[in-house]
């Protein structure tokens, strides 16, 4: 009747204990078995599980691309860009506050419960789009508290992959995100045009429910049981899971600080671009729904190639830091092109460059993961996701304000190509926010130059021992892993032959 969490002296104690007291280990063991049964899922943790979770969640939201533009314009006919930035801004700020906390708690209680929670609350606003637009936008803002699926997913992947495999694994997860956006906007636009927005919302809701069921039934827990406490009743103090305490180490470790500044300066314009770009294509460039869908599909397909085929080759030949620098260079180029471009062909050309810039995030995630110990991956990825959440709050508001200053407003839902729009398209800088974003990314590039190429350290752990102080000592890394290059062998088929404990079953 002993459990794994009992000490060697416990059998002797049970021999002299009363029957009532001796029943306590049985209850604790049965409770632990019951709580762990739903964590098992199918097979060993793999990139397959992470990829399906990401795909379903963002596929559901991708279906709503066209209906969301309609509801946004109908709800806020005046200053649409500005209100869009405000809504996304509140969501991003809440994500910034919650991401380190959720990442730290997932290091203690496991990844699966928080995967379930983040997906559920992130997708909760979907059916509200047809019920009440005001409630829909309100819940989108509040859902930012749990909109940190990527941080939990990357920590999930880090639990079962070796250090030199993670950049490839992160690339596949990010590519799955791009793949979910290849077809879903087109499907959503087709259903909306032929059957109405209500059917699109229904399909998106069903896909979100399918994702939740997949996590419940199929996704196995990736965090080793000996790292987790014996039960959910374990005492977790606020100090152990304080998001601000976990953020304090950013200033104490120079490498982590440089990485975080790089992420902030590079993702700030990217977040603003994501929040307003489809509206910009309609209002300023004159793209219709079909062209927007085709544009998303093209960029998505090219992003998949960039984050799978090219990323592994670049990491092997250039190294982690230089791959990040290359991605930032592509981002500067595409933002400048969007800023000066006023014709449709320029948008298509800049989209190919934008796809190549998508290698930055998985490369940065691999870089921060190398500075975190095995039991601190959730905290490490939570910091990055928290900073991205802050950018999701500031970026859309910044872009919306710049559009407002330059009198770019969504006066009509469809493409507007009349004489009122000609002066803007003929202006020297048709897209001022994008050019401003290129300047910010240039600053990020300069900061990234000072990131060390490789430094093995307990960076995240040594300043965050309070998160795992009550847990058992994590398994030590082997010395061979400490000296091996970043991506010894990134062939995705060979990675799938690893032992179950360190398996990286690629897509």
From Swiss-Prot:
Residues 1-51, 106-113, 158-170, 220-257, 305-323, 369-389, 452-507 are extracellular. The chain crosses the membrane at residues 52-72, 85-105, 114-134, 137-157, 171-191, 199-219, 258-278, 284-304, 324-344, 348-368, 390-410, 431-451. Coiled coil: none annotated. GO terms for molecular function: transmembrane transporter activity. It holds the Pfam family MFS_1. GO terms for cellular component: membrane. PROSITE patterns: MFS (PS50850), SUGAR_TRANSPORT_1 (PS00216). It is found in: Membrane. Residues 1-22, 462-483 are annotated as: Disordered. Residues 462-473 have a biased composition (Polar residues). Glycans are attached at residue 464. Keywords: Glycoprotein, Membrane, Transmembrane, Transmembrane helix, Transport. It comes from the Eukaryota. Its main location: membrane. Residues 73-84, 135-136, 192-198, 279-283, 345-347, 411-430 are cytoplasmic. It is a multi-pass membrane protein. Belongs to the major facilitator superfamily. PANTHER family: HIPPOCAMPUS ABUNDANT TRANSCRIPT-LIKE PROTEIN 1 (PTHR23504:SF32), MAJOR FACILITATOR SUPERFAMILY DOMAIN-CONTAINING PROTEIN 10 (PTHR23504). This is Hippocampus abundant transcript-like protein 1. The lineage of its organism: Eukaryota, Metazoa, Chordata, Craniata, Vertebrata.
